Amino acid sequence: MRSVTLLIVLFLSLTITAQEAGFEKGIVAFEAGNKAYLEEDYDVAIKAYQEVLAEGLHSKEVYLNLGNAYYKNGQTASSILYYEKGLLHFKKDVDLLTNLQFAENQRIDRIEPLPDSIIKRVYKFLLNLMDSEGWAVTSLIFALLFAVAKTIKPRLRKIAGPSLIVALIAFLTLLFIQKIERSENYAIVFEPAVTVLSDPKIDAPVAFELHEGTKVKPVESFEEFQKIEIANGQSGWIVTSSIRFIKE
């Protein structure tokens, strides 16, 4: 048993040491990226910021600076991709949203989006109230309040019922938000121009054309093809290698 305990302690020590080493390496890479960015050496800056992400360090500043470096380097699709990746973690960040909009203005395609569905409108409304973490914390707080009121503080029993209701509503809201987010994955077109086909085969009729930086929604895959939808409801098939997924 003693040897097992020592092994566990050693494993935990090595894990913590590795995490600290990764954090320090990420900080060094981030500072190197900032220096290269200020010197307008965008290739070096991009490589450094990618190293930060490879170390598992995800911050708004890393995604923002990486997107900016790609944009300054003339790589619009990559800049859009990393602003979008940043918004997966920091959904309401004004800087990421502003720079994304600026980069999107450089795209060739001008697509008029369809109105949001009822489910999408509800999803956005709930996220405007609180993000996923906020709903999770709310559910936990009111669940604890219910437990305290029910078992520890008899005088608070009158708030036990309302606390349980709020906890359940917050929890169900969290599940709804997570389900929507898990079911949706978008991608960015990375080719200067790509033909969207009516069927998943090379000689299929061309449905329409898209250009670098356009955001698409993959809905189905078949061999080397991906069926995609765009914001105006049009759909078709493209070669999977011509897009990069926002969630990887």
Predicted regions and their residues:
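Membrane-embedded alpha-helical segments of integral membrane proteins
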Residues: 109-152
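Boundary regions of SH3-family modules and the immediately adjacent low-complexity/disordered segments
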Residues: 76, 154-194, 198-208, 217-219, ...
